[in-house]
Swiss-Prot record:
Keywords: Ribonucleoprotein, Ribosomal protein. This is Large ribosomal subunit protein bL17. It comes from Mycolicibacterium paratuberculosis (strain ATCC BAA-968 / K-10). Pfam families: Ribosomal_L17. Residues 123-186 are annotated as: Disordered. GO terms for molecular function: structural constituent of ribosome. GO terms for biological process: translation.
Amino acid sequence: MPKPTKGPRLGGSSSHQKALLANLATSLFEHGRIKTTEPKARALRPYAEKLITHAKKGALHNRREVLKKIRDKDVVHVLFEEIGPFFADRNGGYTRIIKVEPRKGDNSPMAVIELVREKTVTSEADRARRVKASKKAPEAAAAAPQAAVEPEAAEAAPAPDAPEAAPEAEAAAPRPADEAEGSSED
């Protein structure tokens, strides 16, 4: 059962408010973001989010329910074919309201309402964590054999502070085959 809205109506009458919200929602779905007054943005947010929830379901009944409110068939098509599937894995919070500077003429508070197009922060954080872990895994695997070799080398070689130790270490180090052949030819 429809319940009356508390407080004053946007535009004066309830029919004007319905038309106003339908037009704002049409513009929002068409352009992705709109700049409007803050009270209109706050009234539009739940209205638009309910329409997106209908679009996520995607059934014919839901499409007809949305067509009762938004008369532009092209916008409804975009809503059901692009916007709804984009938010399929998101439970609410499809829009964002950002306050901007007041309007110059009458100093009324303005806001930008937009569709949240980027994925959630948690999914980005999970992806970043997986990438970081995948980078560490090969490095750790490569570092493990080197770590086993390094203690042996540290025990065999004297402290690197001694200058005479460096030539001995170079002499003890195996030379590549090309250098070995070149020195035997001399």
